[in-house]
Amino acid sequence: MDQYIGKMLDNRYEILERIGTGGMAIVYKAKCHRLNRLVAIKILKSDLAQNEEFRRRFNAESQAVAQLSHPNIVSVYDVSRGGDMEYIVMELIDGITLKQYMEKRGQLNWRESLHFITQIMRGLSHAHSRGIIHRDIKPQNIMVLRDGSVKVADFGIACLADSAQTLTQEALGSVHYISPEQARGDRPDARSDIYSSGVVLYAMLTGRLPFEGESAVSVAIQHLSSIPLAPREINPDIPEQLELICMKAMAPDLEHRYQSADAMIADLEAFRKNPEVEMKFDLSDLRPEENDEPTRTIRT
C-alpha cells in the first residue's frame, strides 16, 4: 500500500488517493480539512527530497509560483514548510491532460487548436510578466477541463527540471518540445516557452510531432539543425495564416521568433477575428544560418 495514503500533512491535508506519477513527483488527491475542499498535492520524490540544495530551490520556486493567479494557470494554494517531505498543494482539476486529450482525439481541427493555444499563451503571458518562465511546456503539463478551458500546470516543478534531467530516454517526453537554446544548454527565457508552445500547436494541428528520433539526443539535435515539414503539407485544411503563426513561434533563431507571449496572442486574436487577415512572415526566416538548402517561402 502507498505509504502516504491516509496520512495527514501539517494537521491539515488528508491524503486520499494517488492520481498521477511523474519523473520528479507523485500527485495525490487530498482533502483540506481547514477549508473543507479537495485539492491535489504533488510530493517530491524521496531521492530528490534528500538533496538539500534541491529542496531549497524547490521551496523557493514553489513560493514564487504561488503568487501567480490566472484562469489559465493551475493555482498553487500552499507549499510545505520543512519536515521530512517537500510538497505543493494545488487546485484539483476536473479534466485530463492535453496529451491524453490528443491521444483520444488524434489530429485536432484548427478552430479547437486555436482555442487551446490562445489560452495557453494567456497563461504564459501572465507568468512571464511576473518573471516566471515555465521551461517545460508540453501537452503533459497542460490540463483540459470539461468546459473546454485549459490550464498550464507544473510551473514549480518545471523550473527545477534543468538540474535534475539530462537528455536521456527518460527525457524524451520533454525533448520533443524543447527549444533550440535549451538543447544547446543555454539559459532559457520567455521565448523558449513560446517555441515549445509552437510545437504544441504544431502537434495539435497535424497530429504529429515536428521531429522524431530513437533517442532524446537525436531529437534535440533536430531542433538545432532541422526545419520541420510545414503543417499544411500534412493537413491542407489548416489556414495558411495559422500555419505562419505556428512556424514563427517555432523559429530556431530567437530574433525571428515572437518576442513575447503578448505578441503571439495579438496575431492569434487577429486571425480569430478575421481568418483572412494577412500575417507577414517568411519561412526563410526559420532556416538556421548554417543550413544552405534552398529556401521555401510562403506568402499570404
Where are the model-predicted features located?
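Activation segment signature within eukaryotic-like protein kinase domains
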Residues: 116-117
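Activation-segment/catalytic-loop signature of the eukaryotic protein kinase fold
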Residues: 79
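Protein kinase catalytic-loop region centered on the HRD/HxD motif
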Residues: 121-132
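Protein kinase glycine-rich loop
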Residues: 16-22, 27
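C-terminal lobe helix-coil module of Hanks-type protein kinase domains
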Residues: 143, 174-279
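Conserved short submotifs of the Hanks-type protein kinase catalytic core
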Residues: 83-97, 101
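AlphaC helix of the eukaryotic protein kinase fold
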Residues: 43-67
